[in-house]
């Protein structure tokens, strides 16, 4: 016999979490639990405002429709809504025990704040020093100067930078001007520096700063291929779709000689632990981009190892659908 439950969560965010144009005050999403006999599987459905194509309400409607079929014994195709496809595929994989349990809890530290604070945090990082810095929120020249200072001060540091298509080509060049050419190879990649792919490609070739595709990966005309100056693709499953789609993208990236990075869309601790398992399975040689839990004030159902944040249990969540 099959049963399914859909829970809704809302976790307050730390102050100062800004998406593209708005402050994110709470992270809201759905957790799905599939039960078949003694086996169960969980997944998270959490569209990210300003980044996902679907809203949470739309995702809930689609999830309920899929679950209604599933409990009736009908196997439906993946949802066309990426967050729904990802969450339901995780729940099915756990149910079928096809999502490996081993997890990669390493994370590229997400760095915000002034350079002095960043330096202290980065200096204290154990092991491989890989950090992610958001650029494009302030002046490009300022970003370039900060990146240069960090790379100069910490010779074993590798940076991943994310501009979210913030810059014109001129501003991107302004950034590069302040990064010493001798240090640029320690920028693992800069995600989507310019507003168009063509400008980003030109920027990479002209400056020697490697780029990665992020937003582009979710666009209909995108193809994974080796290109001069392109080092990686960033895969955010909540925005991309099912586990099968993620696996396909990773395989295509590796075949093209590109790095594939499994990355967070600010999921709850439950979703993050599943992303850590996905990373250990599909991209074991690459540190995943999962350092977003500390943006929240609580964990949900499953804890991240060693996190001091309080845990919201299943009993504390609201049930929005059950059959």
Curated annotation (Swiss-Prot):
Cofactor(s) recorded in Swiss-Prot or TrEMBL: a divalent metal cation
BP GO annotations: menaquinone biosynthetic process
Annotated EC: 4.2.1.113
Binding-site positions, Mg(2+): 162, 191, 214
Keyword vocabulary terms for this entry: Lyase, Magnesium, Menaquinone biosynthesis, Metal-binding
Membrane-spanning segments: none
Top EC category: lyase
Alphabetized Pfam families for the sequence: MenC_N (PF21508), MR_MLE_C (PF13378)
Entry keyword annotation includes S-adenosyl-L-methionine: no
SMART domains membership: MR_MLE
Pathway: Quinol/quinone metabolism; 1,4-dihydroxy-2-naphthoate biosynthesis; 1,4-dihydroxy-2-naphthoate from chorismate: step 4/7; Quinol/quinone metabolism; menaquinone biosynthesis
GO MF terms held by the record: magnesium ion binding; O-succinylbenzoate synthase activity
Record's catalysed reaction(s): (1R,6R)-6-hydroxy-2-succinyl-cyclohexa-2,4-diene-1-carboxylate = 2-succinylbenzoate + H2O
Top-rank lineage group of the source organism: Bacteria
CDD domains xref list: OSBS (cd03320)
Active site: 134 (proton donor), 236 (proton acceptor)
Family: Belongs to the mandelate racemase/muconate lactonizing enzyme family. MenC type 1 subfamily.
Function description: Converts 2-succinyl-6-hydroxy-2,4-cyclohexadiene-1-carboxylate (SHCHC) to 2-succinylbenzoate (OSB).
Protein name, per record: o-succinylbenzoate synthase
Species whose genome carries this gene: Yersinia pseudotuberculosis serotype I (strain IP32953)
């Amino acid at each position: 016999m099959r049963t399914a439950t859909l829970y809704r969560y809302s976790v307050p965010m730390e102050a100062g979490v800004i998406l593209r144009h708005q402050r994110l005050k709470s992270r809201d999403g759905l957790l799905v639990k599939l039960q078949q006999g003694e086996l169960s599987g969980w997944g998270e459905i959490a569209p990210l405002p300003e980044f996902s194509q679907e809203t949470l309400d739309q995702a809930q409607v689609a999830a309920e429709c899929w679950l209604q079929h599933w409990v009736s014994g009908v196997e439906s195709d993946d949802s066309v809504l990426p967050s729904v496809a990802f969450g339901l595929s995780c729940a099915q994989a756990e149910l079928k025990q096809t999502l490996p349990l081993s997890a990669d809890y390493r994370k590229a530290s997400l760095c915000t704040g002034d350079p002095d604070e960043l330096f202290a945090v980065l200096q204290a990082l154990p092991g491989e020093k890989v950090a992610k810095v958001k650029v494009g929120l302030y002046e490009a020249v300022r970003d370039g100067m900060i990146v240069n200072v960090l790379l100069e001060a910490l010779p074993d540091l590798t940076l991943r930078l994310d501009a979210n298509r913030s810059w014109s080509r001129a501003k991107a060049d302004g950034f590069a001007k302040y990064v010493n050419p001798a240090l640029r190879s320690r920028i693992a990649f800069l995600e989507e520096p310019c507003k168009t792919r063509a400008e980003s490609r030109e920027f990479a070739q002209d400056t020697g700063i490697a780029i990665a595709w992020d937003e582009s990966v979710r666009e209909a005309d995108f193809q994974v291929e080796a290109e001069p100056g392109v080092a990686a693709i960033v895969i955010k499953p909540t925005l991309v779709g099912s586990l099968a789609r993620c696996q396909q993208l990773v395989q295509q990236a590796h075949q093209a000689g590109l790095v594939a990075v499994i990355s967070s869309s600010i999921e709850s601790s439950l979703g993050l632990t599943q992303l850590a398992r996905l990373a250990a399975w599909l991209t074991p040689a690459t540190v995943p981009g999962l350092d977003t839990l500390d943006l929240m004030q609580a964990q949900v159902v499953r804890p991240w190892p060693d996190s001091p944040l309080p845990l919201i249990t299943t009993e504390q969540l609201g049930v929005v659908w059950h059959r």
